[in-house]
Curated annotation (Swiss-Prot):
It is a single-pass type I membrane protein. It comes from the Eukaryota. This is Putative L-type lectin-domain containing receptor kinase I.10. It catalyses: L-seryl-[protein] + ATP = O-phospho-L-seryl-[protein] + ADP + H(+); L-threonyl-[protein] + ATP = O-phospho-L-threonyl-[protein] + ADP + H(+). It comes from Arabidopsis thaliana. Glycans are attached at residues 56, 124, 181, 204, 225. Keywords: ATP-binding, Cell membrane, Glycoprotein, Kinase, Lectin, Membrane, Nucleotide-binding, Receptor, Serine/threonine-protein kinase, Signal, Transferase, Transmembrane, Transmembrane helix.
Length: 616
């Protein structure tokens, strides 16, 4: 019996030794002269000085480098790992820089299905965000892509099965000497150290310049359970990079990795291989050509100087302190000028009370709408700031999403998503547009009601729009209503009182009490009621060409005006309509029943919606 027990103990002991050896992986590459246990594909290659080059001067390419031995996940022991590598991203001369690179953890070394450019050779369109991707990546991204909600063009992100990062931060490091974060330019061409540590389901990412030790504080910390990402428990680690039309050279100088806690091998930073910096090629020229070039240079100096000052004035921008407070994304005027082809008439979408709107296409993004606002002294600046504030604070599916802004001399520019179907008033009053069906009108009204309810009760502050009308409502590809144009908006704290005493708005939509009581949520509700009648009747609030008694669609409104929460309940038929008489005692003793009339018109219209498939 004793001998049998001894055999069992010995077998268990050797099994544990074997299991431990399977789970622990550790290696270091001070240079990559020896490619032992490395898998390279795509444009990846090792230069004579031992530098691992991922991408070169070719466009639309991918590169992958993986350590060939896999890491086995144990069901009994949580995975932990640490890696330290030094990389350098070098743009071509005269080019802002291409796409970045990433440290990758994957169950496979086969990325033939991946795409280049913004997908970094890791992801693709068809499986973007799919759990079956089974990929964890720490990206060093040098292209701003709003489709992936990138914060800027110089950031670090943690990606799980998608290029839409679960955690992101601008490239920087914590300086223990200065006690604050110092920024890092990923495209500086200088070596950058990166540390990735995973333990107890927490992923920490740190970075620092070549000469700085590992910071005491990580740049990014994200809770991630790798067991949820990798069901087959067999992993490979390595790097991926890609180029598009824009190109950068991406290099890895040294790399150390370990799954054993505290056993990450160090390499000598002072002995790193030199990073090459591409220069423009020059051919041998004869003295005659040299003299000719000198003459042309002198002749062109004045022209170039003039062009410089002309372009400097053309694209000059203004920056003020309030912009840093709101932290919204700022576009360069040059990028917007090029996106709209110089605000060409072919991209002109329309003109409103505060400026013209143009269609434009920014680099690597969908079409955008660029509003070029009119300048009118302090009032114009207030309208511009109001929209910038709304861009930072307000997020709702029925609001036009503002993406950024620009200010240049006396011009204010706002960038938003391009709404495919234009503004609502075009579909109501333009004979060239298809007539909206009753179901479409109902969806639009309910969407704007939801947006207005959010502005009044759901945002951090009470937001008074103060200019609700059909021309300020845009329609997306599915004909959902999106409320926009916050140039007249005002903000105040919940429970507070608005200081908006000026009577602003559009005639026909303005509540009568606004002249002596100022704006409030009730005046927004009045404008919404007029808008609702306008949509259901297909008639403008004011028609000057009609007989005097028929010019104004709605003249007065009852004092018992509902809140936006009640309006939504009415629209969803979750609350019975109030029983108003045709006229009630109210302002000037002539208060007609707007919400009753609007609801009556809407109810009769909507009751036919189930059978109405054609235009109303």
């Amino acid at each position: 019996m004793a001998w049998g027990l001894f055999q069992i103990l010995m077998i268990s002991f050797f099994h544990l030794i074997k299991l431990s050896s399977q789970q622990e992986t550790s290696f270091v590459y001070e240079t990559f002269r020896s490619q032992e246990n490395l898998y390279l594909d795509g444009s990846a290659t090792v230069l004579p000085n031992g530098l691992l080059q991922l991408t070169n001067a070719s466009d639309h390419q991918m590169a992958h480098v993986f350590y060939k031995d896999s890491i086995e996940l144990s069901s009994s022991k949580p995975l932990s790992f640490s890696t330290h590598f030094v990389c350098a991203l070098v743009p071509q001369p005269g080019v802002e820089g291409g796409h970045g690179m990433a440290f990758v953890v994957s169950p496979s070394m086969d990325f033939s299905h991946a795409e280049s450019t913004r997908y970094l050779g890791i992801f693709n369109v068809s499986k973007n965000g799919s759990p079956s991707s089974n990929v964890l990546a720490v990206e060093l991204d040098t292209i701003w892509n709003p489709d992936f909600e990138d914060i800027d063009h110089n950031h670090v992100g943690i990606d799980v099965n998608s290029p839409l990062s679960v955690g992101t931060a601008s490239a920087s490091y914590y300086s223990d000497i200065k006690g604050k974060n110092e920024s890092i330019n990923l495209l500086s061409g200088h070596p950058i150290q990166v540390w990735v540590d995973y333990e107890d389901n927490m992923l920490n990412v740190s970075m620092a310049p070549r000469e700085v030790q590992k910071p005491s504080r990580p740049l990014l910390s994200q809770h991630i359970n790798l067991s949820d990402i990798y069901p087959n428990r067999r992993l490979f680690v390595g790097f991926s990079a890609a180029t598009g039309t824009a190109i950068s050279y991406q290099y890895v100088l040294s790399w150390s990795f370990s799954t054993s806690r505290g056993s990450l091998q160090r390499f000598d930073i002072s002995r790193l291989p030199e990073v090459p910096h591409p220069r423009a090629e020059h051919k041998n020229l004869s003295p005659l050509f040299i003299d000719l070039l000198g003459f042309l240079a002198i002749m062109g100096l004045c022209t170039l100087t003039g062009m410089y000052f002309f372009k400097r004035g053309k694209y000059a921008e203004i920056t003020e302190e309030w912009e840093n407070e709101f932290g919204a994304h700022r576009f360069s005027y040059k990028s917007l000028y090029k996106a709209t082809k110089g605000f060409h008439k072919d991209g002109f979408l329309g003109k409103g009370g505060f400026g013209e709107v143009y269609r434009g296409k920014l680099l690597l993004s969908r079409e955008k709408a660029v509003k070029r606002m009119s300048h009118d002294g302090d009032q114009g600046l207030k309208q511009f700031v109001a929209e910038v504030v709304s861009m930072r604070c307000l997020k709702h599916r029925n609001l036009v999403p503002l993406l950024g802004y620009c200010r240049r001399k006396h011009e204010f520019l706002l960038v938003s998503d391009y709404m495919t179907n234009g503004s609502l008033d075009e579909h109501l009053f333009d004979d060239q547009k298809p007539v909206l069906s009753w179901p479409q009108r109902l969806v639009i009204i309910k969407g704007i009601a939801s947006a207005l309810c959010y502005l009044h009760t759901g945002a951090d502050q009470v937001v008074l729009h103060r200019d609700i009308k059909a021309s300020n409502i845009m329609l997306d590809a599915e004909f959902n209503g999106r409320l926009g144009d916050f140039g007249m908006a005002s903000f105040h704290d919940h429970g507070g009182i608005s200081d908006s005493t000026c009577a602003v708005g559009t005639i026909g939509y303005m509540a009568p009490e606004i002249l002596y009581m100022g704006a409030s949520t009730r005046t927004d509700v009045y404008a919404f009621g007029v808008f609702m009648v306008e949509v259901t009747c297909g008639r403008r609030p004011v028609e000057p060409q009609l007989q005097l008694e028929k010019q104004i669609l709605i003249e007065w409104v009852p004092e018992s005006r509902p809140t936006m929460e009640q309006v939504i309940l009415y629209l969803n038929q979750n609350l019975p309509l109030p029983d108003f008489s045709p006229y009630t005692v109210g302002i000037s003793n002539h208060s007609s029943v707007l919400i009753d009339a609007a609801s009556l018109v809407a109810s009769r219209s909507w009751s036919a919606a189930s059978s109405a498939t054609n235009s109303p």
